[in-house]
Amino acid sequence: MTKEYTSLGLMSGTSGDGVDASIIKSDGENQYSLVLDKYFQYDKDIYKNIHKIKDNINTYQDLKKLSKEIRELEEKITLFHAEVVKSLAKDDVDFVGFHGQTIFHSPEKKISTQLGNGKLLSELTKKKGHL
């Protein structure tokens, strides 16, 4: 019998309103079962800051100009995700998948920027992670 893994996936889309979390069990090839789907709304401060930064980014240069604010928001977003993981992930979760929060997406320029510190999330939650 193939080993079954339990994984927690975190997704925060361009709406910037919160985090969708799903726990699945899978052998990684043929078997899959959904254990849980849950939504976690960002607090007003995080929501406001995501949209303030997104509204002020029109070019790659804007990302550089806002680097201090972006780093501060990235830490807050990572801490929020860590609380989500801690509230859901018991000892049997093998992996955590972490997308981060999209703040800039320009397909024509082939640039996309997501906020989230995978290393910090792993340290805070004591879980293996993949960014």
Predicted regions and their residues:
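Short acidic/glycine-rich loops and adjacent helix/strand connectors
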Residues: M1-L131
